[in-house]
């Protein structure tokens, strides 16, 4: 039993929180062959509360898919302007020009205008980035998505835990919950309006669902023992979770409307960290049934289970990419815990993060292009991002405290 408890504690603490203030992205490695794009500084942007063209440039540069310059040249050119049209009202317009089409109106590949308040300038900037990204790459952009994470602020004899939500680039952080007890395992509902998480309020584990906009909360699971690792089904009607109410930790699925439970695993091993497939038919989970932590896949309907990770002695916290073929996971290499991608069809594992430090808590962007995780960087616990092919690496340094246990939102709006 001591071995079981220590494994569960390790599993849970891999997701436990540090502290996170305003973030600034730092691109540590970019992809070769990035698409050149010229983003000309928007006229009027310097006098507005937010510099729209700078935000768009940062978004596209940090995606790793683009090489951004401010010189007007090449096939892809972005121009725009920001006009003050009233008290705290701005008109933002932009054009994406295709240099191959010429220099007149025929060169306009994409254009849009917005009338907004000053407080919406960052939001519109991210929307412009999404539009440009999708037009050029054919894939939906992730710049308007959000991230959730837990912050631990430590002082002598006391820790404070804060569940926060911010833009995907770390700006506009907003606390959802502050507690003197641990908070962990945030999981976004597929509608992007709710977050499920584990809270130890009252010194016991509870799974709570909180409305992101209103802050209203409801306790979904408060059984004796472990209530952990919530994961929303793709249709938003069910929650996979880990319960130990009958002894060993096992995977269950709860119907959120009726609160009825279906037990998925039923044995004396440690079964934890469930994650849904995109079609909602199967669950990935971590189990020590083979001797050490490995990732397994089980049918929600039949309970038929098979092992999917074989490379290495430690693989855990698997989650599907949107294609249903690739799985992000924690993979131990040479004593370090790294973020890796498992190709289920080929059976191959690709390590994505550097091998000189531990990384954990992978969360995949909704378009599958990037993976968010927590790691140690320059002696601090911070959030990092890595592209699904490992060619692009970003760190989001926290200015105060430690940041960990991130969760990427679905597409919003």
Labelled PLM ranges:
Residues 140, 152-162, 198-206, 221-226, ...:
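A flexible loop/linker signature enriched in serine peptidases of the S9 family
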Residues 147, 195, 236-240, 280-284, ...:
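Hydrophobic beta-strand positions that form the internal "hydrophobic ladder"
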Residues 23, 74-131:
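Amphipathic beta-strand/beta-sheet edge segments enriched in Tyr/Trp
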Residues 141-143, 190-191, 234-235, 278-279, ...:
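Residue-level detector of Asp-centered blade-edge/turn motifs that repeat once per structural unit
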Residues 6-15:
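Bacterial N-terminal signal peptides
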Residues 167-182, 210-228, 254-272, 298-314, ...:
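Multi-bladed beta-propeller domains
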Residues 24-83:
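Short beta-strand->alpha-helix linker/helix-N-cap micro-motif
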């Amino acid at each position: 039993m001591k071995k079981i408890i220590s494994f569960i504690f390790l599993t849970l603490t891999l997701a436990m929180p540090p502290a996170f203030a305003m973030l600034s992205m730092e691109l540590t490695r970019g992809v070769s062959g990035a698409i050149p794009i010229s983003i000309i500084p928007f006229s009027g942007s310097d006098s507005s509360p937010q510099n729209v063209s700078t935000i768009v440039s940062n978004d596209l540069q940090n995606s790793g898919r683009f090489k951004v310059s401010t010189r007007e040249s090449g096939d892809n050119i972005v121009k725009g302007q920001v006009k003050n049209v009233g008290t705290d009202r701005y008109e933002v317009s932009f054009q994406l020009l295709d240099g191959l089409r010429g220099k007149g109106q025929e060169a306009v590949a994409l254009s849009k205008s917005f009338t907004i308040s000053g407080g919406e300038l960052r939001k519109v900037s991210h929307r412009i980035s999404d539009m440009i990204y999708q037009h050029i790459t054919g894939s939906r952009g992730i710049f308007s998505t959000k991230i959730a994470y837990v912050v631990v602020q430590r002082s002598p004899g006391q820790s404070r835990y804060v569940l926060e939500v911010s833009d995907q680039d770390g700006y506009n952080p907003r606390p959802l919950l502050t507690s003197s007890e641990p908070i962990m395992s945030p999981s976004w509902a597929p509608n992007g309006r709710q977050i499920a998480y584990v809270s130890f309020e009252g010194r016991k584990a509870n799974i709570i669902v909180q409305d992101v906009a209103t802050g209203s909360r409801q306790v979904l699971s408060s059984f004796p023992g472990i209530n952990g690792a919530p994961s929303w089904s793709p249709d938003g009607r069910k929650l996979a979770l880990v319960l130990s109410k009958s002894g060993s930790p096992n995977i269950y699925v709860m119907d959120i409307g009726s609160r009825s439970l279906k037990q998925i695993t039923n044995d004396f091993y440690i079964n934890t960290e469930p994650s849904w497939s995109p079609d909602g038919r199967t669950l990935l989970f971590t189990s020590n049934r083979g001797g050490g932590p490995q990732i397994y896949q089980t049918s929600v309907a039949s309970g038929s289970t098979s092992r999917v990770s074989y490379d290495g002695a430690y693989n855990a916290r698997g989650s599907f990419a949107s294609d249903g073929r690739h799985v992000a996971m924690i993979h131990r290499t040479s004593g370090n815990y790294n973020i890796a991608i498992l190709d289920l069809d080929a059976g191959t594992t690709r390590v994505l993060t550097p091998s000189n430090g531990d990384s954990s808590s992978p969360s995949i962007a909704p378009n599958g292009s990037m993976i968010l995780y927590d790691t140690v960087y320059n002696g601090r616990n911070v959030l990092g991002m890595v592209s699904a092919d490992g060619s692009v690496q970003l760190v989001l340094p926290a200015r105060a405290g430690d940041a960990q246990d991130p969760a990427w939102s679905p597409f919003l709006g």
